[in-house]
Structures are given as C-alpha cells and as structure tokens.
Amino acid sequence: KVKLLLDALRERGALIVFNDHPLLTVKLTNQLPALAGGLAGLKAERGTALYDSVVFSLFYFNGVKGQRAILLLSDGKDEGSRFDVEETLDFARRAGVAIYTVGLNIPRSDSEVRKVLKKLAEETGGRNFFIKDSTELAGIYDAIQLELRSRYLLAYQSTNSSRELRFRLVDLEVGRSGLDAKTIRGYYP
C-alpha cells in the first residue's frame, strides 16, 4: 500500500524501521522496488523507541534538498527512548520537516497516545490520521500526496533585530473563505 503513495508522489524515499532502536533499512532512493522490498515481512516486535526513531529520521534529512516529510506509521507508544516528545518536537522544528502520523489500532480511550501523534503532526505542518484497518491506508496516502503536491513555500524576513535564538511563533491567516492554511507552529531564527 505504501507503493500507492510512492507511485503518486514520483519522488524519493527512504525506509527507517524501528522497534527498540531505529534502523535505516533502505537509503534515500527513487527506486520503488527497493522501498517495497524493505517493507516486505515487517512485523511489530520488542519495544518501541518512537521518539528516538523520529529524531534519527530528522537527522537523516540533514543536507537533503527540497520538500521533506516523514510518514510515521505507529501504535503511538514510546518505550525506552532517550528523547521525550518535547525534545523530539524541538528537533523537528529546527529541521523544518513535516511529520504525517498514522496511528494504527489506537483505541479512542488512549487519549494520551492520540494527543502525542496529533501534536507531532500539527506542530510540524503535517497531518494526523487514526485507522483501525490497513485497508484505510490507500485513502490516507491519497490525502497526503495531494497535500504535499499542493504546498506553497512562503518566505518571511523578520524586522525583529533581536539576536535571540528562541523559538518564534507563526500565525498564518487566509483572507478567503473556503480555504484552509496549515503551517508550522513556529521557527528558530
């Protein structure tokens, strides 16, 4: 099913799998068979170092030009990461990489896990989804590819001459009804 997303994007991708640690399974490539092959036979086992794996993925993007996004498929639980969610978000903000989260089989009652996946997506300019069955992935991949293809890059130069390197919030409003604008929550100068 990831093949559907990669076919639609006609871009490059890498595959990083994780359990108790992240592992680069397929380096950045535009060869769909390599990515599809890397996905074959994956199964959940051992712990889930979710935050460490996201940070690892963000570092992998260092030096990669163009639009960059992470598609995170997970049950949302983190077990044993050295990083916490706030540190992970800090890395994501600095990297400027959108995170799209797909929560797999997460009960509505597990609100904390849902909240974390939603936060990772929304604060990085991505989007979150929750599904019960993998048959729903095709529709999600369509939505993600449409969104990635419909992005615009806006540049802004602050008049704030302060040399402070603190996080600065961004507020973007669209002056036309019926349009939805999504952006990163902020940036570091």
What is the meaning of each model-derived region?
Residues K1-P189:
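Scaffold/interface architecture of coatomer-like assemblies
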